């Protein structure tokens, strides 16, 4: 069930949920790129442009830049930060960037729209503890458990990681499909405020907003770090047309990523200032929000991708049949 709340945003707050909004923009992005799915072969690449939102998932990319790891592996990398999900999706579709830090939903929507891409590696979410999404409510709501949310509106954005996690959490709590009621609120700040002001019974939120809510008295009913398996991943999606000539460059970026992951593991607090700056963490949680561990660069598994594709098909979010090859990382239409 789905309702819609139309509220004007008072501000912007970024986390990887924002990239989930790009799945809606993927189809229009293809139109803006010229509606062409025929991509010419690329010359051998020695550099790479990677697009991202202001999100913790990209910390290793920024650490590699700060520490000079790209130069150590003879590759030039430009990290381009986008202020909106549609801008990121459009730039990827148009070939203005070679890779994007995104999620499986956005990637599948782009592929269904005619954009060839490869899921190069998981940037966050190799384990359930990496990255957090959950359902939060206000203390005035009277909601004490997920069971209390059956039949009540939960603020969420459709075809996003938070919606997927919300469905999994509610299903684990025994809710049927008809008992999960979506209140469509795309903008994260508006969704968060709607929850705190009791305009919705609860909201599906990413980790930074869960932390903000917890710091101000909100109640997290459940999150995906335990109990529902490993259900949320961020990925580096790479354009297939660029990859034709970019395999060596991508391998160099992979090595630099792994160097950055090791550096963060050795001294996570040493990179807090960089994370606060780049991910625009709210001041109230800037000093306390835990710095995640990050995975070494490895392809997403079928167990990560296929359930998401099945969920998208069941929701009719995909306009083409998309399949994942876990041996190569290719995401293609059948």
Place the predicted regions along the sequence by residue:
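Conserved C-terminal helix/tail region of periplasmic/extracytoplasmic solute-binding proteins
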Residues: 310-334
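Secondary-structure end/capping motifs
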Residues: 244-319
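Structured segments of extracytoplasmic/periplasmic soluble domains
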Residues: 64, 73, 91, 95, ...
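Short, glycine-/small- and polar/acidic-enriched structural segments
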Residues: 42-176, 182-185, 201-207, 230
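Bacterial signal peptide processing site
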Residues: 36-38
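Pocket-lining segment of extracytoplasmic ligand-binding domains
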Residues: 105-106, 182, 187-275
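Short, solvent-exposed loop/beta-turn-alpha elements that line the ligand-binding surface or hinge
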Residues: 72, 126-128, 226-229, 295-303
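N-terminal secretory signal peptides
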Residues: 1-13, 17, 22-31
